[in-house]
């Protein structure tokens, strides 16, 4: 099966998500001929996966230790030393995996020494004595395969001409440019730790501006229009719109000229974490934790309706990666 062009991969939602595939299928994925580290399940590009399974083998490597000293002349130093030791014990108990443990792993696929492996960005033991999560995953996977993974990736109608014989090259080039520009903007705000920005600020950045005026993606008939400031503004707006839909940036309040970067919004992260901590201390949420939609409703009440599911999911993922919260069940979260 022929691979779709790499510029169009961003239009496939499977590529942007953590694919929940059977381990057998992950081992049999075909690596892309265009981009190393990207794999294909049928015609869907896969770069990251979400696995729930049982540990059947443990291979331990040499441990490394870092030794330090603390001056114990004060009670404060003793208290600090005790807290550090307790934290180390808690982390060791959560990180140590034994045969028979049920674990959840999220990460990207990699080939190392001719073997397929998943490099974990987050992993943790799952407390599932009644097998609820495993049964839920067993019921969920056939549905995902039927309605997403096994279905062919079809381009939107506006990217194919009426005869369906040849793709509209001009539309494909513009769409590819917008998708690439959105990725460049996302990387730019991440690498420079930008908390918020105005659209004209991005348009003045040479690295982003050169991408928007890349002649490789501009046809001869449109070269004059595409180089104009109006067309450049349109490209940036559509690229930002993609980031808005993915929850990478958002707008709040009456000022719609400012874009806030979700991953760098400490106030939003702190509010979400405190809300989960407070609600998990209550009797109704103490056992399972808080459901995602309940968290969303509470955050919207305090922060505003500008927070949608995509934005909150990024915040939840960041809190999980920092080990501030863990998922107790599918879409349920609790804080330490």
UniProtKB/Swiss-Prot annotation:
Q: Which InterPro entries match?
A: CST_STN1_C (IPR015253), CST_Stn1_wHTH1_sf (IPR042082), NA-bd_OB-fold (IPR012340), RFA2-like (IPR040260), Stn1 (IPR014647), WH-like_DNA-bd_sf (IPR036388), WH_DNA-bd_sf (IPR036390)
Kindly give the Gene3D superfamilies that the UniProt entry links to this protein: CST, Suppressor of Cdc13 homolog, complex subunit STN1, N-terminal domain, Nucleic acid-binding proteins, Winged helix-like DNA-binding domain superfamily/Winged helix DNA-binding domain
Supply the alphabetized keyword list. Answer: Chromosome, DNA-binding, Nucleus, Telomere
Domain of life of the native organism: Eukaryota
Q: Where is this region: Winged helix-turn-helix (wHTH) 1?
A: 162-263
GO terms for CC? Answer: chromosome, telomeric region; CST complex; nucleus
Feature: DNA-binding region: 49-126
Query: Region Winged helix-turn-helix (wHTH) 2: start and end of each range?
Result: 264-336
User: What's a Gene Ontology MF term here?
Assistant: single-stranded telomeric DNA binding
A UniProt-annotated Pfam family: STN1_2
The UniProt entry's coiled-coil ranges are none
Enumerate the subcellular locations listed in this protein's record, separating them with semicolons.
Nucleus; Chromosome, Telomere
One GO-annotated biological process of the protein: telomere capping
Q: How does it assemble?
A: Component of the CST complex.
Tell me the protein family, please.
Answer: Belongs to the CTC1 family.
Entry function: Component of the CST complex proposed to act as a specialized replication factor promoting DNA replication under conditions of replication stress or natural replication barriers such as the telomere duplex. The CST complex binds single-stranded DNA with high affinity in a sequence-independent manner, while isolated subunits bind DNA with low affinity by themselves. Initially the CST complex has been proposed to protect telomeres from DNA degradation. However, the CST complex has been shown to be involved in several aspects of telomere replication.
Q: What is this protein called?
A: CST complex subunit STN1
Organism equals: Aquarana catesbeiana (American bullfrog)
């Amino acid at each position: 099966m022929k691979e779709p062009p790499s510029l169009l991969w961003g239009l496939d939602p499977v590529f942007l998500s953590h694919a929940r595939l059977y381990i057998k299928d992950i081992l049999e994925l075909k690596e892309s001929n265009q981009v190393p580290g990207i794999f294909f399940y049928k015609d869907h590009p896969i770069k990251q996966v979400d696995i729930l399974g049982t540990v059947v083998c443990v291979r331990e490597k040499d441990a490394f230790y870092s030794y330090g000293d603390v001056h114990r002349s004060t009670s404060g130093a003793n208290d600090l030393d005790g807290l550090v030791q307790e934290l180390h014990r808690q982390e060791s108990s959560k990180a140590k995996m034994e045969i028979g443990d049920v674990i959840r792993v999220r990460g990207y696929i990699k080939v190392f020494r001719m073997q397929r492996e998943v490099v974990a960005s987050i992993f943790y033991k799952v407390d599932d004595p009644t097998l609820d999560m495993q049964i839920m995953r067993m019921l969920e996977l056939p549905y995902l395969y039927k309605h997403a993974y096994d279905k062919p990736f079809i381009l939107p109608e506006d990217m194919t001409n009426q005869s369906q014989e040849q793709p509209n090259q001009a539309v494909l080039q513009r769409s590819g440019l917008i998708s690439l520009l959105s990725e460049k903007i996302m990387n730019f705000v991440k690498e420079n730790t930008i908390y918020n920005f105005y659209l004209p600020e991005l348009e003045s950045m040479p690295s982003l501006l050169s991408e928007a005026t890349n002649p490789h993606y501009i046809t001869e008939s449109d070269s004059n229009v595409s180089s104009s400031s109006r067309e450049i503004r349109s490209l940036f707006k559509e690229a930002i719109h993609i980031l808005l839909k993915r929850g990478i940036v958002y707008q709040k309040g009456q000022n719609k000229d400012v874009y806030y970067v979700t991953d760098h919004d400490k106030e939003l992260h702190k509010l979400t974490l405190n809300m989960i901590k407070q609600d998990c201390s209550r009797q109704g949420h103490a056992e399972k934790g808080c459901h995602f939609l309940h968290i969303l409703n509470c955050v919207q009440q305090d922060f505003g309706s500008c927070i949608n599911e995509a934005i909150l999911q990024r915040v939840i993922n960041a809190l999980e990666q920092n080990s501030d919260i863990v998922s107790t069940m599918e879409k349920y979260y609790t804080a330490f």
